[in-house]
Amino acid sequence: VSTSDHGRNNVMTISWHMMMDFTPRIAMATGPWDHSCRTMMKTKQWVINVPTGELLETVVRIGTVSGADVDKFAAFHLTTLPARDVQAPLIAECLAALECTVVDYVKRHGLVILEATRVWYNPWKKEKRVCHAIGDGTFAVDGETIDYRSLMTEKLPDGV
C-alpha cells in the first residue's frame, strides 16, 4: 500500500484485506500505531499495489522498517508512477494497483474501508503469481508456501 503526504511517498505492507460485497469497496486492517495509516487517515488516499512472487522478499523487508525513518522507495529501489485519482504513487514493479479513497474507519477494530476509484494493470509484467500473507511469517505465492519467518522474528507476536 502506498501513501503520499505533500510529496513524501511511503509504502507499507498489509497482511489482511478483503473485498466487500459487489461494490468497489475493500476492508483493510491497520491502525494509528503505523506511520502510513496516520498519513492515510490525514489524506484519505491510498494505492493498493499488487506485488508478484519475485518481489516477496522486498515486500517482507518493507514491512520491517518505518517510513517515518526510511525512504522506502529509495531503500528498496522502487519506481513510482503517478496515479490519476489520488496523490499516492503506483509502484511500477507491481502487477497491478488500485487507487483508493477512505470511506470509513472502524477505530475499535482498526478496520479501514476503502473505495477503489481506478485500477491499473502492468501488461509488461511477466510474473503473474501474486503474494499472500499466511500470518505467521510465511507466505503463499499462488499455491507455493515460502517461509520468511527469520526476517520477521522481531515483528511477530509471541506464540506465533
Q: Where do the protein language model's features map onto the residues?
A:
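Basic, polyanion-binding surface patches
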Residues: V1-V160
